Structures are given as C-alpha cells and as structure tokens.
Amino acid sequence: MRAIWNGEVIAESEDTIVVENNHYFPPETVNKEFLAESDHHTVCPWKGTASYYHISVDGKVNENAAWYYPETSKLAEKFKDYVAFWRGVEVKD
C-alpha cells in the first residue's frame, strides 16, 4: 500500500493493518520528512487518544491529515504508533 499526497509518496508498506477501513502504516515506513507534529488530538473509546501530523509537500500543507496512537488501550496495542491518513491523502495498492 502507498499513501500519496500532492504527488509524493508519504508512506509505503506491504504490512499495513486495516482498522475501521483505514490502513495503518508501520512507523518506519512513513517518510517523516513530510510530517510535522500537530497539537490536535482526538479520543476514541476503544483505541485511545490520537495524535496528529500535518503533511507538507512543496509548500502546501494538509493540516491534521495523518494520525497515530502513541498510547493505546489493550485492544489497540497491535497498531501503536502506526500512522493512518485522510483529508485527500490517497491510499492505494
């Protein structure tokens, strides 16, 4: 799977984990050069508190377009720190 935004591959892996129709990419497969920490957080009752990244490519910024769970519930430990995408980021084979 690949996550693409603004013509750049943000993440690529054959080992994503699918949760609620979202592909979560292992952290080591994400090109962190395109990511900047956001101060945005959301809470999922069964996964835990999500932290977000802004994606920046060629001067364009997609705010809070990637998220991950740095601390998870027991049910979500399998994808702790894995990164998922939305807001126009194309995830495809």
Short names for language-model regions:
Residues 1-93:
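Terminal leader/tail segments of proteins
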